[in-house]
Structure formats: C-alpha cells, structure tokens
Amino acid sequence: MTAVPPSCQILDGKALAQKMQGELQRDIAQLVAQGHRSPGLAVLMVGDNPASAVYVRNKEKACEKLGMVSFGKHFSADTDQETLTAAIASLNEDERVDGILVQLPLPDHLDAVKLLHTIDPSKDADGLHPVNLGHLVRGEEGLRSCTPAGVMALLAEYNLDLTGKNAVVLGRSILVGKPLALMLLEKNCTVTIAHSRTQNLADITRQADILVAAIGKPEFVTADMVKPGAIVVDVGINRLDLGEGKSTLVGDVDFAGVAPVASYLTPVPGGIGPMTVTLLLANTVASYRQRLGI
C-alpha cells in the first residue's frame, strides 16, 4: 500500500470486519450451546463467473468460520427464471434458512429484480427487497443493504461526527448510492447524490466533508476533487490489468493522490469490501434471532 501521511488516518475495514465477525461467532456459539440450531445462509449462484465464484467461496468460508450453516445452490448458466423462482420459494419455506442471497450478476436472460422480489423480506440477507428499502426510507427497523450499512458501521467505529456535515455520494445505484444517501440523511448529514449526468462535478465534490465514491471507475476521484480534511470512502473495487498475466485491485479513488488531502480514507482492498461480507452475515444472524424470538 502507498505510504500514508500522518495527517490522514486509514479507516481499516478489515480490522473492524474481523472484530464484528468475532462478536458474531461468540454470539452464535452461545446460542448453539443453549440448544438453538445454527443460523443458515443460502447463496444462489448461476453460471461460472470466476469473480462470482470467488465471492461465493469467501461467503461460505466466512459462514463456516462463524459456526453458520451454508446452503450453496449452484445452477448452470442456462437455468430459466421459473427454476430459480421455485428454488427461492423452497428456501423461503425452509426453516433452516435465515438468509437468502442471489449472487449478482446473473446471465442476461434472467430478470434479477423479479428474482430478488421473490425472496421473503425477513430472509433478505442483502437488504435489497422493496419492503426493506421501504423500511429504510421510513426510518424503520429492517434488514439494511450490506455495503451502505458497512460504510456507516465503519464511520461509527471511528466515532466520526456526521451531524450537519455535507455528504456527497458519487453513484445512484440501488445497491449503494441511494440507500447510503438515506443512511447519511438519518445521521443528519446534508446529502447530495452525484452521477454521470452531474454538471460541474468537481465543484460539488470539493464541498463535501464526507465524499463517497461508488461508481466503478478506477481511480476516478483525484486530489483536486477533494476538500482538504474530508472523509473519503472508496466503495469501488476495480481490477486493473498490469500485463504479463498480472493484475491489481484499485478503488474509485486515486489513493496515493488523495491521501495527502483527506483526513480519513478507506483503502482498497481492506476497506469496504470486508465490511460488506460482514454485514451480510450480521443480517442473517439478525433474521435468525427474529425468527426464533431470541
């Protein structure tokens, strides 16, 4: 990792994820010792996307480490919508399953939105069902979208006061940008969502006390776009080809350039990525507790 000046503190998502997973592991062990079953997470994967396969394996390993049961469902790339809908319906009824996740992206012939809508909202481990998003809009309790919730947990861990701060979110996806804007609003930030059609983007980002990049463009945010002393959160994960069969992971922020300007900065890897997986597990345990009334 690039050397970071003393004026910039790294927001260490990997360390917090390990801490939170340790707490979940102890929680689960205690509940199982009391005679309860282990929490169960079902992950549905369609096709053989290499990146998706890695993500699924990581989630299954994390489940095993925490004492959770993983119900992996792997379907061929030509599986039709009806088969997947039936599989989700079966998992909705399965009392061993507390969380259901459909690994994205799906093959083009499948309607991901319709599939996500068929998941029982109480088992929506990813927090993307319209019912759970509706709870977020209304400020009610519910399962939260994993990546935005991971961002908020990381900011909270460092006791960063968000009240009254100007927050700019780059990206308006339903996965990150929109729910994160709502979560920042809950913490009394003044929130701006910027996107590909935003004019005078750098003028807007330079007003941000908190700048979140979630657009999937490698090292898009440069030092001249950042307000001195800002909190910068990099949600992007982009693989850059270095040639000769080598590659590296970078975020949406030019880490080396922005570190001397920001007061807090998340690294890639080791920032928001580990938090996303951890919040997925936390959602599953929360669903498990609710379903068992414990």
UniProtKB/Swiss-Prot annotation:
Keyword field: Amino-acid biosynthesis, Histidine biosynthesis, Hydrolase, Methionine biosynthesis, Multifunctional enzyme, NADP, One-carbon metabolism, Oxidoreductase, Purine biosynthesis
Metabolic or biological pathway: One-carbon metabolism; tetrahydrofolate interconversion
Reactions accelerated catalytically: (6R)-5,10-methylene-5,6,7,8-tetrahydrofolate + NADP(+) = (6R)-5,10-methenyltetrahydrofolate + NADPH; (6R)-5,10-methenyltetrahydrofolate + H2O = (6R)-10-formyltetrahydrofolate + H(+)
Pfam name, any one: THF_DHG_CYH
Example of a GO MF term: methenyltetrahydrofolate cyclohydrolase activity
Gene3D superfamilies: Leucine Dehydrogenase, chain A, domain 1 (3.40.50.10860), NAD(P)-binding Rossmann-like Domain (3.40.50.720)
A biological process term (GO) from this entry: methionine biosynthetic process
EC number: 1.5.1.5, 3.5.4.9
Quaternary context: Homodimer.
Xref: HAMAP family: THF_DHG_CYH (MF_01576)
Family: Belongs to the tetrahydrofolate dehydrogenase/cyclohydrolase family.
Protein name in UniProt: Bifunctional protein FolD
Native species: Synechocystis sp. (strain ATCC 27184 / PCC 6803 / Kazusa)
